[in-house]
Amino acid sequence: MQNNKNYTEKFITDKVMRRDYSKIKSNFEGPNLLEIQVESFKRFMEKDLKEVISSIFPLKSPQGKYTLAFKGLKIKQPTKDESACRDEGKTFETPIYIDLELTDNYTGEVKRAQRNTKTGEDGIYLGAIPKMTEKGTFVINGIEKFVISQIVRSPGIYVLGKSSIKLNGSRKRLFEGKICEIYPSKGTLMLGYIPKDRHNIQIVARDSSGDNAQTFSVTTLLKAFGLTSAEILKIFNNEKEIRESLEIEKYAPEYIFENSQENEIIFKIYSDAHDIHEKADRRESNNKLKEEYIEQGSPLLSKLKQLIFNYVEKNDEIDALLHENKDVEDASFIKNNKKLYDEREEIINCIISEKAAKDIVELLGINIKNIETLRHLGKASYQIALQQHFFNKRLYDISSAGRYKFEKKLLLSERLYQKVIANDIIDKKNNILIPKDTLITKEHIELIKKESRDKNIKWTKKINLLPTALESEIEQFLEYESIAVYKDNDLRDETTEIVGLASGCKLQTLTVADLVATTSYIYNLNYEIGEFDDIDHLGNKRLKLIHELLRARIATSMARIEKFINEKLAISDGSSNNITNVNDKGIDTELDREIEESDMSDEEKKKAISVKSIINTKQFQSLVKDFFNSHQLIQFIDQQNPLAELTNKRRISAMGPGGISREDPNLDIRDVHHSHSSRICPIETPEGMNIGLIMSLASLAKVDENGFIVAPYYVVEDGVVKEDYKYLTAHEDDNYIIAESSVQLDENKRILDEQVVARYRGSTGLFSPNEVDFIDIVPKQVVSIAASAIPFIENDDGARALMGSNMQRQATPLIKPYAPIVGTGTEFKIAHDSGMAVVAKNDGVVEFVDSQKIIIRNDNDKLDDYKLIKYRKSNQDTCNNQIPIVKVGQRVHKSETIGDGPAMQNGELALGRNILVGYTTWRGYNFEDAIIISERLVDQDVFTSIHIDEHTIQCMKTKNGDEEITRDMPNVSDTAKRFLDNQGIVLVGAEVHEGDVLVGKTTPRGNVETAPEDRLLQTIFGDKSKTVKDSSLKVKHGQEGIVAAVKRIKSSDENGSELPDDVIEIIKVYIVQKRKIQVGDKMAGRHGNKGIVSKVVPIQDMPFLKDGTPLDIMLNPLGVPSRMNIGQILELHLGYAAAEIGKKQLIQIAIDQLGYEKYISLFGINEIIAKKLYENISNLIKHKQAKQAKDIDLIDVTIILKELGLSYDDIGIKISTPVFDGANHDDIVSIMNEANIDIENNKGKQVLYDGRTGEPFDGLISVGLTYMLKLDHMVDDKIHSRSVGPYSKITQQPLGGKSQNGGQRFGEMEVWALEAYGAAYNLLEILTIKSDDVQGRNQAYNAIIKGHDVVADGMPESFKLLTKQMQGLGLCITVETKDDRMVDINEYTLNQNRLNNDDDEVILDENLKEINDSNEEIFNTNFNNNDYDDEENF
C-alpha cells in the first residue's frame, strides 16, 4: 500500500471495507429513506384520525333534546398477522372503535354503546383501516400496495402577470395585469387585480354554478365583511387606488335609499317600514306589526328589515327633536345631538354592509343550505352567510400550508427589502429600532423578523368592524401591521402605505386581515413593492402524502355519517313535523309517545333510542375500502429488487386527482427548475409520456409538516462551516447565499477560497466566504438514490444517466449476487432502508441462527425473534429470500443489518455481477448494441435467477352442487394428471409443463335427464362426463417449472380462515423457474448501456488476456462515443485495477501474517472459509518460499480458491467513489499503478488474443471489470408461437398476444413480401383458412385428420364485410360461377353457407363417433387401472 493515500479505508460493516475516494468528508446521517411513507402514516394514526372523527361532534338534535358526544377512540391490533393476510388474500388492517355518549338533555339519562358480544370490545365499530407494514407498504387483499406522493400547487396567495378561472365546459376566463390570486385548499378561487388603464381594484370569483366569473370592487367585499368607507380609507392611508374603488361602487349613504333597480329591495322595505311605523304610532300597537313584517319571507332578509326599521325609527326620533328645536341652529343642534347622528350613521353603514353581502351572496350563488349557523334562529343574515362561506374551515380551508404561504407573502418583513421607510420603526418602549429614511437591508430584515416574533414592534393595529359583523368567527384575527415607504427610493417625495399581516396567526381559514393585506399588495405592485411569483417554483408546490389523502377520504365519510346521525336525531327529537306538545320536561315527541304507550318493558323502552340505532358506519368502511382498492395514487409496489421498491416509495407524481394529465404538452411543467436543487432529482424520470410528471425525491430531502420538500445545509457563520445544519424550503433557499460543498476548508472548517461558487435567488455567482449563509452537505444530495448509485455519473450524458437510473430498478435478483467492486458508498444505505433486509430492533447478542430465523437476546434480557422470509413470491414474480449474515455469539447493535434480502451481499445492494468485459467487435455479433457472452455465465449460473408463479383455484358452491377437488376428472389423460396425489393436488417437487394438471377439480353440470340404462352404464364404467365437467387448474400456455409449494386454505380450518361466500376452499400452487441467461435476454450496465444477448460463445472461443483469462462479455466499442456515457470506461479501468490489487492483497496479507480477519473485512467472505483460505495460502507461501506476491503463480491460487468454492469474483478490494465527488483522473492513475497496469505505453488497454486462432487482435483493447445487470425483460416471458388457438367472435380472425395464445399479424407489407416471391398458395392459406374463412377452416381441419388434400373454397368474413359495405354504397355485387352464370352475391353466400353447413354436420357426426369410441376406451382403462392404490400417497 502507498504511504500517501488519496483515499480512506471505510468500514461499512464488519465484513465490508471500501476505499473511499471522496474529497468531502461529512458525518451527516441522512434521514431514513422510508420516512416519507412511514412518518406520514404514523402522523395520521396518532393525530389526524382522531381529529377528523371528533370534528363532527358533539351533535345536537334540532330541538335540543339529545346530544351525541365523542368520548374517545380505540385502535386495536390486527386480528391476523401480515404473512397470514398475504397467504389468505386478506387485508392487513386494524379495527377502529369509537366511544360515543348519547345524553337526553331533559331527563339527564346517558347512554353508551354496549359491549360487542362478537369481539368483546366496548364502543361502536367504525371500521378497519389498513395498517402500514414496517417497510411502508399496505397488504390489500393479499397484495402489497403503496401510496404514491402527489405534488400539487400549494394553497396560498400568488402574484401573477396572467391568470385564469376555469368554467364549465372546458372554458376559461383569462385575466392579465397585476393579479393577486387567493388559492385555497377547499373553497372559491378569488383573483384581486387592477384592470388595464384603470386604478381601481377588483375581485373576480367563479359563481357556484361554474358558468361565469363574477366581478365586483374590493371595497364592496370589505364593506360586506363589516368595514366602513372611513375605516377602509384609514387602513390604506387614503391611497388613490382605494379611493377610486370606493367611487365606482354604489354602496354609500347617498345611494343606498334611492329608487333604482339595484336598490329595489331596500327601497321597498324602506317604504313599507315608513307605512308600518306610521300605522303603529296611530294604533299604538308598538312592535307587533313590525315583528310580523320582519318575520315574513326569507329569514335572511330579517336582519336587513330590522336595520331599516331601526333607521326609520332613528330618523323619526331626530325629526321629532328637530321639530321641537326648530329655532336652534343646525350646526349647534348636530353638535348637541352627536350621539343620535352617530347612531344613525352606524345603522346606515350596517344597512350598506348587509346590502353588499346580499349582492355578493346572490352574485356568487352561495348555497344558503350549507351555512351551518343559519340553523340557530335569530342569527340569519346575508352577512353571516357570506362570512360562513369564506371563514368557516369546513367550507373554505387554506390549510396550514396556505397559512404559511400567506405569511411568507404578506408579512411586512417579507416586503420591505431594498425599500426606504418613511416612518421610524419603534419598539414597545418607544425606542427607535430603525430610523426613517433608512434603506432596508438583509440585516434589517433579520432584525424585523426577530422583533416581530417577540411582538416587540409598535406598528400593529386592529380593524374596526361594524357591530353586526362581530356576531360570528370573523373577529378571530383582525390585527394588521402597516408602515409608509417612499414610492421612489431616490426622489423620496411621495409615500405609499404597506399593509401586512400581523405575525402569529395560526388560523387555517381566510381572515379579514388577509384580504386587507392582499389589497395592499396589489396596489403596492405599482411601485415595485413585492414580486411576481414563478408558478413552477418548487416553493409554490407541496406534496400530498398518505396522511392527507386518507384524511380527506375519511372527512368525506364522516360528513355522510354526520348527515345520517342528524336525520336520526331529528326523527328522535320530533323535528320532522312530529312535535305534539311542550310540557315542563321539555318537548314531547311522537317517537317518545309511541314508546311510552307501547307494551315494551321499562328496560326495552330505555334501549329504544340507543347510540347504535342512530349511527351507520357503512360509509366509513366503504370509502376506506374504495380508497385502497381504486384510488389513482394507490399502486402495486414494484418488488423487482430492493432499489425498485425503495424508489417506488420515494416517487412523486404530478398526475392523479386534480393533477396534470399525461397528455398535457406543457414543457414548463415537466422541465427541471432551479428550485428542484437538492429536493427533486433532475435525472430520474420515466421516458415517454410521463417524462417530467413522475419524479423522485433527492437523496437527503425530507417533507416538512406543511408538505413542502426541504433540503439540509450546514450553517456558515463568518466564513466558518458549523457542525449544525438546517432544513430549508425552496422559498427559503432564495433568501440565502448557499455555497457548493466542494469549497476548500482548513482543519477548523474555515473556508480558504477567496471567492466561492454559490447560488442566490436562482442564479450562480462568485461570493466572498463571509457572505455565505449555508453550504451543501455533500454533492450527491442533488440526485436521487438510484442516480447516486451510478459511479462516475458526472461523466455520463444526462439521457444515459436517466436510463441507467431506471434500468437499475429492472435488475433481476440473482442466485448469487455480488456487490459492485466500484460502488458509490450508497449501496449499504439503500439496502438497509429498503425494508427487504433484516434489521436488528435492539442491541444484543445473537443466541440462535438458522435459515428460518434469528434469535437475539437484547440488553433487557428479552428474546427478539426474527423470522426470515423464505422463497416468497414478489409482485413481479421474483424470489424474495432472506439469508442470515450474523453468527451465534456475535454482538449486534440497533439498526444493524443481520440478514440479507434479495439482491444483497453482506448488507450492501447487489443488483448484478462484476464481469470481465472487453470493448471489441466479434464477427458482427455485437452489432447495434448486441451483447456477446461467454458460456461460463451460463454454466456457472453467474446470471441465473429464480422466478415464482402463483396459480390459484377456488372450489365453489354452485346452484347445481358443490365443486369437488379430485383426481378423477372426465376426459383428462393420465399423462396430464401424472403428478397428482390421490386427493387431486400436484406433488411438491414435480416438474410440470404446459397443459399438466396442478389441481383436479370437477364442476357439476345442470340437471340433464338420462335414461335408466344410460345411468346404469355410467355407474358401471365410472363415466362422470355427463354429470360433471372438468374445471381443473392447469399449467398455462408457455409455462413450466418445479412445484415449490402448495397452500390449501379452508374455511373449516382451526385457524378460522375467513373465505368469501360460496367458497369452500382456495388452493395456491407455486411453480418455480430457474432461468439461466440466454440469447434474447436483456442486459445493461449502470450507465445506460443496454443490449440484447445475441450469442453465447464457448469459453475456449472467447478472446483471452495474456495470462489466459477469457473475457466474459464483449461489448461494441461504437456504443460509447455517440452515447457520451464515458463513466463506463472509467468504471472499467478502476474495476480491473481493484480486482488486480485484490489478487495481490490475497497473497500479501498471508505473507505479512495479518491474520484471516483481514480476509473477512476486505473480501466479505465467511469466517470458516476465511480461516481455511488463510491457512492454505500460508502453506503455499511456505512451500514456494515466497517473499512477495509476484513470487506466487496465480494458477496455484486459483486451485486453492476452487477447492473452497470460491473464485476471483470473490476476491477484489471494493471502491467507493461517490457521485460528483469520487475518484478523479489522478486517483485512477494511482490505483492502476498500484495494480501494476502499464498506463504509460498502452493507456490501460490490453492485448487480446483470439480464442479460435490464438492470434492477437490488431489493436489494443479496453478490458476491465464492469458491473452488469440482467434485466426483467427476459426472452422466456416474450417468446411465443401458435398452432391452434382462439378466434375473435366478431371478425373470426385469430386473437393477438401471448396471454391469449394469439397469432402474429400478417400485415400489408408481409403480403407484399410473399407476392414478391410468388408464393401464391402460402398467401392464399394465410389470408383465408388461417385467418377468417370459417367454413374453409373446418374443411381444412377435417381434410388434415382424414389425410385428404386440403381444398379451401370458403369465403373469408372480411370479404363478406367488404361486399356488404359496397352494397351499402348502392353497388350491385355479382359472382361469376364456373359455368359462366352471374349470381347475386347474397344468393351465392346463402348457397355456400347451406352447403358448408351440410358438410359440417357430416364432419361433426364423424368426429362425435370417434370421440365416443375413444371415451369408451378411457372408461375401460380407468376401470381396469391397478397402477396405484387408493391408500398410497403419491
Swiss-Prot record:
GO terms for biological process: DNA-templated transcription. CDD domains: RNA_pol_B_RPB2 (cd00653). It is an enzyme of class 2 (transferase). GO terms for molecular function: DNA binding; DNA-directed RNA polymerase activity; ribonucleoside binding. The keyword Protein biosynthesis does not apply. Keywords: DNA-directed RNA polymerase, Nucleotidyltransferase, Transcription, Transferase. It comes from the Bacteria. One of its GO terms (cellular component) is DNA-directed RNA polymerase complex. SUPFAM superfamilies: beta and beta-prime subunits of DNA dependent RNA-polymerase. Pfam families: RNA_pol_Rpb2_1 (PF04563), RNA_pol_Rpb2_2 (PF04561), RNA_pol_Rpb2_3 (PF04565), RNA_pol_Rpb2_45 (PF10385), RNA_pol_Rpb2_6 (PF00562), RNA_pol_Rpb2_7 (PF04560). The keyword Transferase applies. It catalyses: RNA(n) + a ribonucleoside 5'-triphosphate = RNA(n+1) + diphosphate. Belongs to the RNA polymerase beta chain family. DNA-dependent RNA polymerase catalyzes the transcription of DNA into RNA using the four ribonucleoside triphosphates as substrates. The RNAP catalytic core consists of 2 alpha, 1 beta, 1 beta' and 1 omega subunit. When a sigma factor is associated with the core the holoenzyme is formed, which can initiate transcription. This is DNA-directed RNA polymerase subunit beta. It comes from Ureaplasma parvum serovar 3 (strain ATCC 700970).
